[in-house]
Amino acid sequence: MQLETQDALYVALELAIAALSVAGNVLVCAAVGTSSALQTPTNYFLVSLAAADVAVGLFAIPFAITISLGFCTDFHSCLFLACFVLVLTQSSIFSLLAVAVDRYLAIRVPLRYKSLVTGTRARGVIAVLWVLAFGIGLTPFLGWNSKDSATNCTEPWDGTTNESCCLVKCLFENVVPMSYMVYFNFFGCVLPPLLIMLVIYIKIFMVACKQLQRTELVDHSRTVIQREIHAAKSLAMIVGIFALCWLPVHAINCVTLFQPARAKDKPKWAMNMAILLSHASSVVNPIVYAYRNRDFRYTFHKIISRYVLCQTDVLKSGNGQAGTQSALDVGL
């Protein structure tokens, strides 16, 4: 099958994004795994986010490329390819929400934070979030799908099914109904967490600014609060980028559902660009970590120097010293 120029460009860009996503997010996981200064509950949630982004590069993008080519396969195989992307997206959103709640607790109840948010509890929350993400992403398998309209399977008088009629052109819209994507996925599972995160970060900045205005604060407390503000800004930036990358796809889905006549004329390149933008969100986070966090930046440099450039140098904790900094200092 010969690809058109537009399809070939789309595939090439997807493969580039996949490579960058895998490399960058594996680096994030390795950094947290090798640096004691980065092994905090907050960063465990970021590792969960990075794991989802690695899976986007390894699986979701190849699946998306396969779906974009519109090959013919059985309905449920195509549905699985489509739903897998939804699982990873939902996991990313839940991980970002967990980070927001974690940062709010850190600045709202700083004296109780370490006893409330432990590594064990963080890992337990991550496990629950992934189970929920799979449940939400795989909901179309329970029946909320387009099988009746996408296939022409018939049950002859003898009770057998003509499997050749059950093949479907594997395109996302052919297997997942827009009613699910808009009402359940977007309005129910994507938009509410994003709005909750917006409220949480606004409250974080309000609480932090109010605390900074207290004249009786000692220098150490003021420094800790300033670090929390810096961390919150970085994490809010990640949430904002995630929203900007994913909202175009959901906007197109809304147009498809509510304005079907107009959606029929939508150019293919517009949908391809929206999909590319959504996948590009998986590349951004490691760049933000490296730019905004000294410990991540230092550890990235040490890992690359040792394992990529083969320079023999001992990998220390994020600041080049023993990992004795507080959890607040190693936040973004």
Swiss-Prot record:
One of its GO terms (cellular component) is plasma membrane. A lipid is attached at C310 (S-palmitoyl cysteine). GO terms for molecular function: G protein-coupled adenosine receptor activity; G protein-coupled receptor activity. Keywords: Cell membrane, Disulfide bond, G-protein coupled receptor, Glycoprotein, Lipoprotein, Membrane, Palmitate, Receptor, Transducer, Transmembrane, Transmembrane helix. Residues 34-43, 102-121, 203-234, 291-332 are cytoplasmic. Disulfide bonds join C78-C170. Its main location: membrane. The lineage of its organism: Eukaryota, Metazoa, Chordata, Craniata, Vertebrata. This is Adenosine receptor A2b. InterPro entries: Adeno_A2B_rcpt (IPR001435), Adenosn_rcpt (IPR001634), GPCR_Rhodpsn (IPR000276), GPCR_Rhodpsn_7TM (IPR017452). GO terms for biological process: adenylate cyclase-activating G protein-coupled receptor signaling pathway; vasodilation. Residues 1-8, 68-78, 145-177, 259-266 are extracellular. Pfam families: 7tm_1. It comes from Canis lupus familiaris (Dog). Belongs to the G-protein coupled receptor 1 family. Glycans are attached at N152, N162. It is a multi-pass membrane protein. The keyword Chloroplast does not apply. Receptor for adenosine. The activity of this receptor is mediated by G proteins which activate adenylyl cyclase.
